[in-house]
Amino acid sequence: MGKLLLILGSAIALPSFAAAGGDLDISDTVGVSFWLVTAGMLAATVFFFVERDQVSAKWKTSLTVSGLITGIAFWHYLYMRGVWIDTGDTPTVFRYIDWLLTVPLQVVEFYLILAACTSVAASLFKKLLAGSLVMLGAGFAGEAGLAPVLPAFIIGMAGWLYMIYELYMGEGKAAVSTASPAVNSAYNAMMMIIVVGWAIYPAGYAAGYLMGGEGVYASNLNLIYNLADFVNKILFGLIIWNVAVKESSNA
């Protein structure tokens, strides 16, 4: 029943949003990327909630969180794509509201995947959450004009690097060392997303605000951000799903 309501709710919501924003120009690469990411987030959300019933109890919460991440992103992309198609402006507020919800949930995923198979201190979650909030707060301040662009960029990078340190060298490394091979593999893959996939975001910030002239930054910024969200949110969830299926089959 829950899955049916999810699908029906999405089907009801889509027509009204699809009608908004006018027609999509074939030459509007950024607009096309908004539509592709919107569709991808919806498909991933349905997939994660359907697959939740196929894994053992200790992995259900992880798949639920994966579905929440893509579901929240789907909802915000419905609005963001409309802002872009109607105005050509960057939907900064919508995007950061989305990130303020989904990035901490990705932090939760790291904690959950470790807690499912080994002992992990709650302090790891608190440290990762603090790093993510510094990263997001500084990024928003720079993009919204509340702080100088370059200092905000540096502070945001510091928050991101702190998270990487904790996962690679700190409590994350200590916790995963006692986990199963499947969890180790998933953890390393998730780390690659944090290191390589999340690097797309500062690249977009730099392309939008630190390089290029007035009037060109919006296209650079949104195309890169859309690509990053597509890869980081959906692939992140698929890694969780993969390890959940493997661990459940071995149980």
UniProtKB/Swiss-Prot annotation:
Site note Primary proton donor, residues: E109
GO MF assignments: light-activated monoatomic ion channel activity; photoreceptor activity
Tagged with keyword Membrane: yes
Keywords: Cell membrane, Chromophore, Hydrogen ion transport, Ion transport, Membrane, Photoreceptor protein, Receptor, Retinal protein, Sensory transduction, Signal, Transmembrane, Transmembrane helix, Transport
Transmembrane regions: 30-50, 65-85, 97-117, 120-140, 144-164, 190-210, 223-243
Site positions per UniProt: Responsible for spectral tuning: Q106
InterPro entries: Arc/bac/fun_rhodopsins (IPR001425), Proteorhodopsin (IPR017402), Rhodopsin_retinal_BS (IPR018229)
Signal peptide boundaries: 1-18
Membrane-topology descriptor: Multi-pass membrane protein
Modified residues (N6-(retinylidene)lysine): K233
PROSITE patterns: BACTERIAL_OPSIN_1
Miscellaneous comment: Presents a much slower photocycle than that of the green-absorbing proteorhodopsin, probably an adaptation to the intensity of solar illumination at a depth of 75m, where this bacterium was collected. Transport occurs only at pHs above 7 and is unidirectional.
Protein name in the entry: Blue-light absorbing proteorhodopsin
